[in-house]
């Protein structure tokens, strides 16, 4: 039961960090002129110049929660003693988790560079494929459903990660659409994990 109590605490903490970082990133975007200019791309519907760096705010919130969780392990176990057994599994998966965090950071840096310098599509695609390949190879992420051949599974995983990259990236035509879609996906995966008793 402790996990069901712990996750809402993590969620609220991330929400608070996001509320802190979002206005700061907004100010930084205006200062550095990292803006989404209206009608610069056909699918964008902004009526006026809009500050970017929303992805940076989300990543900083994610990273802050990870750091806070790592530093506050003793406090967690005091209030959520049921986490003890699960944390052993977290320790075993730590190398893969570090790879995932590093790949997430690389994706954010790639996005920031693109926001500022408007990369050519093929260059951005190469960067995304490299990040996805590292994630699929060393990050412990693999799509194996109905697939028994490791190489085919790896290729599908890389394709899927790149697909998600661009799906979320394409949702930047309206404010809040990307984060709203990501929230719906989060709720779906949370329900699936809860149904499978997989914390």
Specify the residue positions occupied by each region the protein language model found.
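"…together with the soluble PPM/PP2C metallo-phosphatase catalytic core" -> "…together
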Residues: 2-199
């Amino acid at each position: 039961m402790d996990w069901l109590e712990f996750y809402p605490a993590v969620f609220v903490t991330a929400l608070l960090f996001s509320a802190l970082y979002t206005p700061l990133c907004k100010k930084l975007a205006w200062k550095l002129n990292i803006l989404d200019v209206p009608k610069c791309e056909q699918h964008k519907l902004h009526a006026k110049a809009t500050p970017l760096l929303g992805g940076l705010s989300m990543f900083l919130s994610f990273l802050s929660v990870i750091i806070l969780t790592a530093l506050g392990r003793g406090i967690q176990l005091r209030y959520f003693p049921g986490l003890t057994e699960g944390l052993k599994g977290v320790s075993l998966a730590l190398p893969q988790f570090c790879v995932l965090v590093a790949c997430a950071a690389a994706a954010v840096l790639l996005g920031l560079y693109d926001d500022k310098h408007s990369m050519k599509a093929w260059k951005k695609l190469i960067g995304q494929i490299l990040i996805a390949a590292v994630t699929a190879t060393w990050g412990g992420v693999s799509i194996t459903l109905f697939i028994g051949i490791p190489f085919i599974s790896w290729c599908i995983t890389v394709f899927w990660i790149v697909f998600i990259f661009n799906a979320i990236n394409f949702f930047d035509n309206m404010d809040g659409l990307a984060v709203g879609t990501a929230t719906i996906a989060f709720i779906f995966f949370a329900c699936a994990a809860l149904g499978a008793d997989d914390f």
